[in-house]
Amino acid sequence: MKFLNYYKNYYTKIFDRIYITEDALSYPESKKAIERLSLPVKEVVSAKDIHKEHLNSKTLFITKRKGAAVKSCPGTRRHICCNYLTVDLYEGCTLGCSYCIMKSYLNFSPVTVYVDSSSPIEEIRKIALNNKDRIVRVGTGEVGDSLQFDPLFEMTADFIQGLANIENLYFEAKTKTCFVDHLLEIKNKGNGVISFSINPEEIVLTEETGAFSLKERLDAAAKVVKAGYNLAFHFDPVICEEGWESRYLDTIEKLSVFPKEKIKWISIGTLRYPPDLKEKIAQTERPYLFDEFVPCADGKYRYLQRRRKEVYRKLYNRLRDITNSSVYFCMESNTVWNYAAGNVPGNLPDTIWLFRAIKG
C-alpha cells in the first residue's frame, strides 16, 4: 500500500517518539512503521524501561505479546455475554471519547502495538476448526480501535487473508475512523467484517471529539461493502440526552441504504461505567453524569432498568423493521432481554447463533 502523506501527518501529530522491544525489531510491520514515521526510536527490553515522562499516549510502543493471543470477551457478572473472542493488536486509542472505559486502566500508558500476528491467526484457526458446528466471531477492537493505526502497520489484512478460507469464522475489525482504503483491494476477504461504532452526529461532536464524523464512517461503510466486505454496526454507548429518541431513530434510518444481507449484526449498549471511570468523566463535567444511574451486579453504573428497557425496545423494534441482521444487546440482563426482545438471546432465532458458547 502506498503510504499517503495524509496518514503520516495524522500519526506524527499523535506521536513524537517510538519505543520498541528488541524481540520486535525484526518484524516487517515494525520496520515499516519506523520508516514511515521517521520519529526518534529507542530500543528497550520491556515496557518497564520506558522513561517515566514518556508514559503517555504521545509514545508509540512496539512489542511482542506475552501470554495468550486469543481471549474471551471479559463479560460481566449476571449479564448475558455473546461469547465473542478478542485479539489485542492495538492497545490504547487517541480518539478522545469522553466515556471510554480505557481511561480507567490505560490513562498513563503509551499506545501499544503487538506486531506478531502469525501466532494469533494460527490460534484462531485452531479454535474455529474445533467448533465446526457453530459460528466463531473474533475481533480486534476490545482495547483499542481496530483501524486507527492500521494503515501504519497493515496487520488487519494479514488476519482477513489468513482466516478467509474458514467458513464458520467471522473476523471483525471495529472502528470509529474512515481508515479503510488500505483494505479495499484484498482479493480473498472470506467472512471479513468491517464494523463501525456509530452515534448521532450530536453525540459525535460533543463526546467523540477526536473520532471521525458519522458521515465519514458511513461513507467508509459504503466503500467496504462495495469492495465485498460484510458490515456490522455498534450503537454503543447509547447516551440518553434530551432528544435521544429522534436522534437515534434518525441514525438508524441511515443504515437502510446498505444491502440487508451484508449487515451481519448490530449491537446496542446503553452508557455504563465502573466507579473509577466516573471520577475521570466527572473531571470534564459531562452533562450525562447528571442523569439517574444505579450500580448493577457487575459493579458498573447503568441507567435505571426501566429506562434501559424503553431504550432497547424502541431501538430494537426499529432495527428489526429495516434490517435482516441479528440485533443484540451488549452486557444486559435476562429481564431487559425479555422485555425488549421478547426472549433471551439463546431462544431467539436471530441471535441463537451469536450466543452459542465456544469450545476451547
Enumerate the language-model features and the residues they cover:
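Catalytic cores of alpha/beta
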Residues: G243-F258
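Flexible, acidic/Gly-rich N-terminal and inter-domain linker regions that tether
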Residues: M1-N83
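Auxiliary Fe-S-binding modules of radical SAM enzymes
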Residues: M1-S26, S256-G360
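Structured alpha-helical segments in the cores of large, soluble enzyme domains
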Residues: I124-N130, H182-K187, L214-A227, L315
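Conserved radical SAM core fold
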Residues: G144-L147, C178-D181, G192-F212, P237-E241, ...
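Cysteine-centered iron-sulfur cluster-binding motifs in ferredoxin-type domains/subunits
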Residues: V87-C97
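Conserved Radical SAM active-site core
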Residues: T63-C81, S98-S197
